[in-house]
């Protein structure tokens, strides 16, 4: 019988996936920037300029979101090391095991998450 991975393993795996995603997005962004520099520099009058600008902004936004997700994962790992993992950062109550299984980096219980929306 194989035991399921613990929170540290889940968070570590998610961290690796997120770092890989950031690296891929940064490579994509670099490629877009290089392509834009090689193409016509006049975005306003170049029919491809708007597309290149959109792709650049889209890749930059995705990379920013991935970096923010990495910070959330790192915060969860810090809470785990400090013995505060599974405790809501808002109300101090427990975070349900089902929520942690679905979102290992969850900072808040379901009640506080619902209130925040």
Question: Model-predicted segments: where are they?
Answer:
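Interaction interfaces in information-processing and related assembly proteins
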Residues: 1-82, 102
